[in-house]
A protein has these predicted regions:
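Helix-to-loop junction immediately C-terminal to a conserved catalytic motif
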Residues: 56
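ABC ATPase C-loop
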Residues: 165-166
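Conserved ABC transporter NBD signature motif
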Residues: 64-72, 232-234
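A short, flexible loop at the N-terminus of ABC-type nucleotide-binding domains that lies
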Residues: 3-4, 13-27, 77
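ABC ATPase NBD coupling module
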Residues: 72-86, 94, 116-119, 123, ...
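H-loop/switch region of ABC-family ATPase nucleotide-binding domains
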Residues: 209-210
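Conserved beta-strand-loop-alpha-helix hinge in the C-terminal portion
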Residues: 229-253
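The feature captures the beta-strand-to-loop junction immediately N-terminal to the Walker
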Residues: 41-43
Length: 267
């Protein structure tokens, strides 16, 4: 099966030629087949978020190619890639417009892909569609379509952001530590919704997480990043036998550095 997402020798450096020069990504290669759910772990500065931003088009790579479904999108702008990619950020405030209603937020997200105006997005047929999708969240938001998004809790906003990023079934879903800012109960809810939505729509998903156990529990593949490189990969079969302890051992074996806890490799 051909790759739905393919990264070829991605290299990105920031502040080149200055004392603050930093290689964020060091010739990264990555292939994901349709339906793959890859979890990504790594320390602060490992290059995880830069990787996400290069895939989404927010940042342009210095060297290398980004291919989506066989098309070279390396230099295609972020707003043009939005038809192919859904993304949920760590900050619950980042995915929604706080002064707009739930309904208006959903209509805008829908129009990005369907290239229709806001008015058509608010038709009765579209409103019924939004209600149907909101019911999946089990948060009662289908009865609060006229509520401002800014009045929702962090967990509710993140659940809404997840729905907005996925209900048009993008080719690729990017989840950038999307539960990290939530309290444990809401993080558990959003994680459960993530698994449900990804499985239902068979979405090709790349998820960065600060939580090793979450990385082990979700997805069919796992990669570990450090200093701009992918230093460890586990396919579905290998991933089933992994534990946090084994991941820490792998890091120590590869880098020659001992990690004292699961958090130390992630923060």
């Amino acid at each position: 099966m051909s790759a739905l997402l393919q990264l070829n020798q991605i290299f990105k450096v920031f502040n080149e030629g200055t004392p603050d020069e930093k290689i964020a990504l060091d010739h990264i290669d990555l292939k994901m087949k349709k339906g793959d759910f890859v979890t990504v772990i790594g320390s602060n500065g490992a290059g995880k978020s830069t990787l996400m931003s290069i895939i989404s088009g927010k940042i342009i790579t210095d060297i290398g190619d980004v291919m989506i479904d066989g098309k070279d999108v390396t230099y295609i702008k972020e707003h043009q890639r939005a038809k192919l990619i859904g993304r949920v950020f760590q900050d619950p405030m980042a995915g929604t417009a706080p002064k707009m209603t739930i309904e208006e937020n959903l209509a805008i997200a829908y129009s990005r892909v369907k290239t229709r105006g806001l008015s058509s997005g608010l038709s009765k047929k579209r409103r019924d569609f939004f209600k149907e999708k909101l019911e999946m969240l089990h948060l009662g938001l289908e009865n609060r379509l006229q509520a401002k998004a800014g009045l929702l809790s962090g967990g509710e906003r993140q659940a809404l952001s997840l729905l907005m990023a996925t209900f048009t079934e993008p080719k690729i879903l990017l989840l950038d530590e999307h539960t990290a800012a939530l309290d444990p109960s809401r993080a558990e809810l959003v994680t459960k919704l993530t698994k449900q939505i990804v499985n239902e729509y068979k979405l090709t998903t790349l998820m960065v997480t600060h939580n090793m156990q979450q990385a082990l529990d979700l997805g069919n593949r796992l990669i570990m990043m450090d200093k701009g490189q992918i230093i460890f990969e586990a396919n579905e079969e290998k991933k089933k036998s992994l534990t946090i302890e084994k991941l820490l051992e792998e890091f120590q074996l590869i880098r020659g550095e001992k990690m004292n806890s699961d958090k130390s490799v992630l923060i």
